[in-house]
């Protein structure tokens, strides 16, 4: 069978998910008899290799070949942020006036094990005419994907680069350098906060090594939705993990901060596809979570392990309740799940850099239907109690509209924050 392109794959996945939703699968799955049959069906389709190592079976397929993405032979002896390799990128669709380099650096995962992470540095060729060095924006994109081909460093070289909200061209027009970390890490651990923080901070360290002229640049971090996870966690972890790095500030919007809230707002609802993807992403950093997957859930995880965002989001049309796919009742209340939820709730310590948080608010119009505002306002309060300088802005719109509505204000905040550092 020929390999499907990402748009075709997304269309088929969306169609299948829609059909499942129309058929009332969400209701049917709540039947124990139906789940037994589905688990039996899935069990017969598992390979011996998948049975032998269930954790390995849900990891993303490595990018093949001996090139840039080949695993480094040995990371011992490397310091976090040390550059392993770097290469220039020529996109299939040429973009005049910019230079693109992607690089791999040493980092650590959630458990503290050495891992390689990748990032992309996009620089205007025009000389910087302002005072001081050229400003840098660390743009943490909402990758929201499980497959390595969806990482920004891979997409940008293939002319299928996606930026949501579309800040990148506006930042380059201001003659800023833009760093794009692959913040989900080498396992595409979507939604895992500590891994994302390490990937971002070590990418910044690596940037200062391949572009030493940017080492003293005023720098801000930015991210929305899945990218906000990386931004918030990097801001919180910076004083402990990378205290030598200086940031002028960080801005994050539509931030998922509390998976207990997301379990109520997304699971079994239109956001169930991305909630399921985030669950798989967390399991890649917390292998004990795989013990909770029933055979049907595990089989699905092996099927979608390389999917990008569109088909994962479209799967929400089926409105599947993940709780019924587990091997135990109320899996979200289990010690394993609660430990992961607690470990991925920011607020235990406060950032030292100024932070702007914004969110679609019912107080303005509509409100974010996927990511409840109360999680962000709680984080604002906790960080302020810890001594952080945090500004909060309630903006009109649901999750997608709020991203666009906030853009002018976010760009002004970036400009003012960067100029204040000169």
Each model region followed by its residue ranges:
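Catalytic-loop region of hydrolases
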Residues: 15, 19-118, 123-126, 384
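Accessory cap/linker subdomain of secreted extracellular hydrolases
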Residues: 38-74, 255-350, 367-370, 376
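Short, surface-exposed "cap/lid" segments of acyl-processing enzymes
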Residues: 109-173, 182-184, 368-370
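Alpha/beta-hydrolase active-site loop
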Residues: 163-167, 190-213
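Primarily recognizes the serine-hydrolase "nucleophile elbow" in alpha/beta-hydrolase
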Residues: 205-273
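Short beta-strand/loop motif that positions the catalytic acidic residue
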Residues: 351, 357-364
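Active-site-adjacent alpha-helix of alpha/beta-hydrolase-fold enzymes
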Residues: 362-390
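Catalytic active-site module of serine/aspartate enzymes centered on a nucleophile-bearing elbow/loop
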Residues: 386-422
């Amino acid at each position: 069978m020929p390999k499907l392109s990402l748009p075709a794959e997304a269309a088929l996945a969306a169609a299948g998910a829609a059909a499942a939703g129309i058929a009332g699968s969400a209701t049917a799955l709540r039947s124990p008899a139906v789940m037994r049959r589905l688990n039996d069906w899935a069990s017969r389709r598992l390979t011996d290799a998948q049975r032998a190592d269930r954790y390995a079976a849900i990891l993303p397929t490595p990018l093949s070949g001996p090139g840039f993405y080949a695993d480094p032979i040995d990371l011992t002896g490397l310091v976090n942020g040390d550059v392993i390799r770097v290469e220039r990128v020529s996109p299939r669709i040429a973009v005049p006036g910019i230079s693109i380099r992607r690089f791999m650096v040493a980092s650590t995962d959630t458990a503290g094990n050495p891992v390689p992470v990748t990032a992309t540095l996009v620089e205007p060729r025009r000389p910087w005419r302002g005072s001081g060095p050229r400003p840098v924006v660390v743009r943490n994109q909402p990758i929201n994907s499980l497959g390595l081909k969806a990482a920004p460093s891979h997409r940008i070289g293939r002319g299928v680069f996606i930026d949501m909200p579309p800040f990148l061209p506006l930042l380059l027009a201001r003659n800023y350098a833009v760093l794009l970390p692959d913040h989900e890490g080498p396992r595409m651990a979507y939604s895992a906060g500590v891994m994302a923080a390490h990937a971002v901070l070590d990418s910044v360290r690596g940037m200062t090594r391949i572009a030493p002229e940017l080492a003293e640049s005023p720098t801000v971090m930015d991210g929305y939705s899945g990218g906000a996870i990386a931004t918030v966690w990097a801001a919180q972890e910076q004083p402990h993990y990378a205290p030598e790095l200086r940031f002028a500030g960080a801005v994050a919007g539509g931030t998922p901060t509390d998976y207990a809230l997301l379990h109520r707002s997304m699971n079994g609802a239109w956001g169930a596809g991305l909630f399921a993807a985030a669950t798989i992403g967390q399991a890649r950093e917390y292998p004990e979570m795989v013990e909770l997957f029933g055979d049907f859930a595990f089989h699905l995880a092996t099927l979608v392990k390389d999917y990008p965002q569109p088909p994962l989001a479209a799967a929400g049309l089926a409105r599947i309740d993940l709780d019924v796919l587990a091997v135990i009742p109320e899996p979200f209340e289990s010690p394993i799940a609660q430990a992961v939820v607690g470990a991925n709730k920011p607020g235990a310590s406060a950032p030292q850099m100024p932070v702007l948080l914004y969110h679609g608010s019912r107080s303005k119009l509509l409100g974010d239907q996927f990511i409840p505002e109360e999680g962000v306002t709680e984080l604002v309060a906790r960080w302020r109690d810890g001594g952080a300088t945090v500004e909060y802005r309630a903006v009109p719109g649901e999750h997608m509209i709020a991203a666009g509505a906030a853009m002018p204000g976010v760009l002004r905040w970036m400009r003012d924050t960067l100029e204040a550092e000169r």
